[in-house]
Amino acid sequence: FDYEQMSGRAGRPQYDNTGYSYLIAKSMEEAIDLEERYVNGDVEPTNSKLIENKDAVFKQIIAQVASTLAKTPEDLQDFFRKTFYGYQMTSNPSMSFFAEDSLKFEIESALEFLLQNRIIQATPEGLKTTPFGNLIAKSNYSVETAVKIKEYATNAEHIDPNELIYHLAQTPDLPLISFKGRKSKDPVREKLASSGLFALDIGNPEATTVSLIEWINERNEYEIENAYNVYSSSTRRAAYEASLLIKFTKNTMEVLGKYNFSKDLDFLSARLYYGVKEDIIPLVVGVKRLGRKRARNIVDIFGEDLRPYSEEQLQKIEGIGPKLAKSIKQFADNY
């Protein structure tokens, strides 16, 4: 099947009459095997995994309701009957007997979950998505992640960056940073404790949490890796995804009517994106390509108010040339 998918892309539609795909063999014997298996062989049976993937079912139901294509459970059942899964269930003699009841049960279970979590609501006009449901429909996040974030948003009385990062590290949408083999996990446990976080088990979510806490406190990947015995090469990616999840958290809170945390969440999102402490956020955001290292040097040497200093003085800092000094000066004068 993979070979058919690949070779089917040979040639450019509307430009080429013929397309060519090649299978490279290391020997004549292998070439014969490849031809027999991939070129002349039958495509292996394909089975739908839709119902096995709970999140896919949730997302399909949300999409159908949000687009007003389905207003009742019966509409949803009719939609799923027309999917590849529905076709396989009804066409298979061994499954067709209980296919209808099985499909109905799965949809009703998923719908009950979505109703309980206020993602979908029942109205006199039929099923409708809530504002939170619309937010999920427009995002790429799993329903599990969205529900976890909503739970946090509902209960939050203030924003603790460390606590929120740990909460996000336990969702399926944040890429995790892993430990190096069987090295000691004690440094991670100790850092969590000093950050006001308690964990019974220390695993990749905890390693990710500690790495991101250190990242927003301006430690680099090398320092994080050596301090906590983790593979820190994916820190930047995890931090970027976490910054986007913080924005989703902000949107979720605003949907719930909690606007008083918006500024704090904007700052935390920026800290994760740039890997900085709060005091240099305006500088790294306001001056393109400055970076956190040079921004920190500037603030450490000149302070946060840069208006009294000339471009020539700024250029004395390593890595800052005339062009960048001009941008910094313009930012300082207009901030």
Regions found by a protein language model. Give the residues of each.
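Long, largely alpha-helical accessory region at the distal end of helicase-like NTP-driven motors
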Residues: 41, 46-136
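Helix-hairpin-helix
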Residues: 281-300, 311-329
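Conserved NTP-handling cores and scaffolds of large molecular machines
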Residues: 7-17, 25, 42, 65-69, ...
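Conserved segment of the helicase C-terminal RecA-like domain
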Residues: 1-37
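Helical mechanochemical/support elements of P-loop NTPase systems and associated helical scaffolds
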Residues: 2-6, 17-20, 53, 72, ...
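C-terminal helical accessory/scaffold domains
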Residues: 108-117, 121-292
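Helix-loop-beta junctions that constitute the ligand-sensing/allosteric loops
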Residues: 303-305
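Short secondary-structure boundary/capping segments
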Residues: 1, 36-42, 143-145
